[in-house]
């Protein structure tokens, strides 16, 4: 991390008599914020802050605001606003099922092609609906192979362990033109204290899955229950062992144990069998021929709904999908997406951003607090402002902020995106103060030794909300 020099808090008054109530004349950070930084053991030069009213031309607070910082998941603000602005809130994606010929007497001779377009939102339920459409159109037997067509994206090999050595975590899944169910398998842990054990139930259909291991039921508080589990994956088998506190109640455990092809194969075989279909072929990668005819298709929800899932819940793989959707041509490549978004930022006079995957799950991505602030100010004045603002978590109410700011002046009055990876904490969005004035607020901390990085950011938001 390069050395960071803080700027002083600047007081901008034009004219002064009209701005006394909305500006701070100080040579240091506001006392609540400075105190929170000290308590968290974050040096002031490892923090960047930017605050500006949406109807003002000058910031109230600009501390280290021009310094490139790692924003973690706050980078999703760039990706989602760019998507809304460039693609439009009504943009959708189609996933198609094609074949060389129509089915005869319920039998499809030859391969069935599944062609993806990069849909970020093809969940288990929506994939089931696509297969149900196939059945409704007369397909009951597939005699050939299932061919997975990912030609909409051209991507380098993805290593799910590269970021934090947690390859089974779904947040580490890579982008995929044929992404199904976020490449995720959902298990449910159900305490059974009477038998001293915990039941593990597979909620996501997966052909051939074998669950092994034993999870003991324990007393005490729930705490960080996931850290008490040991998870191993070997072929069709998932072994889960360790302990699980009965006080936790039922908990969902999401895993990404298989390659994309195997994950789709197991889900497809299980769902197709449930629908009464038969399949005797193999599952393989390939491309649909030009003469293939459409049999069934699924259209995604509009982008305006998708960005809500991305920002409310900080969904990384969905953000990666949107990032690639912004490439100007197909097959989409990461470099093409980076180039287009970088130019889009420059057109808005936001320079110096370093893009990687658009999700913020990166050690390389950078943007300044001022850059994020200018982005949010621009979004406020744009035609897609309602969709963008509605996509952000509401303080104390939903998404990643449901349990944050609940007993403060910010509750229900702040729409904010958070960012959290090791050594990084960030928050950025809009805050409505007690006088009904709306502010753009950005806070980024980059410090490997911080004790509680959320506290200074909470202090920042409260300080604005209480004005």
Residue spans of the language-model regions?
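Mid-domain, small-residue-enriched loop/turn segments at the edges of structured enzyme/sensor domains
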Residues: 46-48, 105-179, 183, 326-371
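A small/polar active-site loop signature that marks catalytic segments
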Residues: 217-387
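Small-residue-rich helix-loop
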Residues: 60-62, 313, 323-467
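Short, well-structured active-site flanking segments
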Residues: 85-100, 280-284, 385-388
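N-terminal signal peptide c-region/cleavage motif recognized by signal peptidases
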Residues: 21-22
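Active-site SXXK
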Residues: 57, 71-89, 146, 178, ...
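Beta-lactamase-like hydrolase cores
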Residues: 25-55, 61-68, 128, 133-137
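Short, Gly/Ser/Thr-enriched beta-strand-loop segments that form substrate-interacting elements
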Residues: 210-232, 255, 293-298, 403-435
């Amino acid at each position: 991390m390069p050395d960071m020099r803080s700027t002083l808090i600047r007081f901008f008054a034009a004219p002064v008599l009209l701005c006394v109530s909305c500006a701070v004349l100080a040579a240091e950070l506001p006392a609540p914020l400075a105190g929170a930084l000290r308590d968290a053991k974050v040096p002031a030069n490892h923090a960047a802050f930017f605050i500006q009213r949406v109807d003002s031309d000058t910031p109230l607070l600009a501390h280290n605001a021009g310094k490139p910082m790692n924003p973690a998941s706050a980078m999703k603000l760039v990706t989602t606003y760019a998507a809304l602005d460039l693609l439009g809130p009504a943009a959708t994606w189609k996933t198609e099922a094609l074949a060389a010929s129509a089915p005869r007497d319920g039998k499809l001779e030859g391969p069935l092609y599944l062609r993806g377009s990069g849909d970020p939102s093809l969940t288990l339920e929506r994939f089931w609906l696509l297969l149900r459409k196939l059945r409704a159109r007369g397909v009951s037997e597939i005699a050939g192979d299932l061919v997975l067509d990912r030609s909409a994206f051209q991507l380098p090999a993805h290593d799910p362990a590269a970021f934090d050595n947690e390859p089974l975590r779904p947040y580490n899944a890579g982008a995929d033109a044929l992404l199904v169910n976020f490449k995720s398998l959902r298990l449910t842990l159900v305490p059974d204290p009477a038998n001293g054990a915990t039941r593990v139930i597979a909620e996501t259909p997966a052909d051939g899955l074998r669950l092994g291991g034993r999870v003991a039921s324990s007393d005490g508080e729930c705490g960080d229950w996931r850290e008490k589990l040991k998870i191993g994956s070997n072929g069709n088998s998932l072994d889960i062992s360790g302990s699980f506190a009965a006080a936790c109640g039922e908990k969902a455990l999401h895993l990404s144990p298989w390659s994309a092809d195997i994950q789709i194969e197991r889900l497809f075989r299980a769902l197709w069998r449930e629908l009464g279909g038969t399949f005797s072929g193999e599952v393989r990668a390939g491309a649909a021929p030009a003469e293939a005819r459409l049999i069934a298709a699924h259209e995604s929800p509009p982008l305006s709904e998708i960005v809500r899932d991305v920002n409310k819940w900080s969904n990384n793989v969905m953000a990666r999908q949107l990032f690639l959707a912004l490439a100007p041509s197909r097959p989409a490549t990461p470099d093409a997406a980076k180039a287009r978004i970088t130019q889009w930022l420059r057109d808005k006079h936001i320079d110096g951003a370093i893009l990687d995957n658009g999700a913020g799950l990166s050690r390389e991505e950078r943007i300044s607090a001022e850059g994020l602030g200018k982005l949010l100010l621009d979004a406020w004045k744009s035609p897609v402002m309602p969709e963008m603002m509605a996509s952000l978590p509401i303080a104390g109410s939903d998404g990643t902020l449901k349990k944050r700011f609940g007993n403060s002046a910010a509750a229900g009055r702040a729409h904010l995106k958070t960012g959290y990876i090791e050594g990084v904490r960030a928050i950025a969005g809009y805050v409505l103060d007690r006088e009904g004035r709306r502010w753009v607020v950005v806070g980024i901390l980059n410090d490997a030794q911080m004790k509680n990085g959320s506290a200074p950011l909470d202090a920042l938001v409260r300080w604005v909300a209480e004005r």
